[in-house]
Amino acid sequence: MEIVALLAVGVALGLALGLFGGGGGILAVPLLLAIGVPTDEAATTSLVVVGVGAIGGLIPNARVGRVAWREGITFGALGIAGAILGSQAALLAPEWLKLWGFALLLVVSGTLMLRRALAPPVAAEDRERRSWLLVALVALAVGLVTGFFGVGGGFLIVPALTLVMGMAVHRATATALLVIIINSTAALLPRAGEALDPKVAAIVAITTLITGNLAARWSNKWSSRALGIGFGSLVLAMSLLIAWEALNAG
């Protein structure tokens, strides 16, 4: 695999994570597929890269007290079983199913991002949490998505933390990074020794981490609305690429 291509993926993913937060990790798999990485390896590598990127983003947020540790650990722990089951299912699923499923996931997530960007601003304060049963079910579903598709799931975690756990948006965005770390680690367990090139993962992860830290400093130069519209549109465009891959896979 060409190092230049891997560096390009790391830079692109770092920009996405730095500018758009944890939700940017959804681009990892499409970008890796675009340079010829097989589907299972792309998903496993994505879990490593997004997990490392989340650690890099969590540290500065923790320093300013933005992370809700108890809620994040609880939500992440409730999703561990789903992440493990999702990974095991992905290793058994046919190529075409994973690709079409991921294309659909991109369409749904891109649409949600656009709707969120175009919606009126939500209240900044924490709200009342819903029932623990609902929290557990949502966390399990997020874990399944993380494990099966190899994505961090930030685009699902942030709305889940705000709507289900009643968390303010800025706290949910920071806390989602903690959940991503937990879910990604759990999802990697069934994939241990399977479909992973350590050199590829290391190059992309390090490049992503460096670029992401730099890009995060630029994010305040654009409005949340502009970033949301731009990223949602990009995710929808990437769904076409994955759909094309799925057609070629039969």
What name fits each language-model region?
Residues 39-47, 173-177:
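Small-residue hotspots at the loop-to-helix junctions and early N-terminal turns
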Residues 20-28, 150-160:
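Transmembrane helix boundary and interhelical junction motifs in multipass membrane proteins
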Residues 157-163, 167-178:
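Aromatic-anchored, glycine/proline-accented short structural segments
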Residues 29, 90, 154, 158, ...:
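Juxtamembrane/transmembrane-helix interface segments of polytopic membrane transporters
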Residues 111, 174-188:
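Hydrophobic alpha-helical transmembrane segments of multi-pass integral membrane proteins
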Residues 56-59, 148, 155, 189:
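Membrane-embedded alpha-helices of multi-pass transport/permease systems
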Residues 45-60:
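Transmembrane alpha-helices of multi-pass small-molecule transport proteins
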Residues 1-15, 29-35, 39, 59-148, ...:
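Juxtamembrane transmembrane-helix boundary motif
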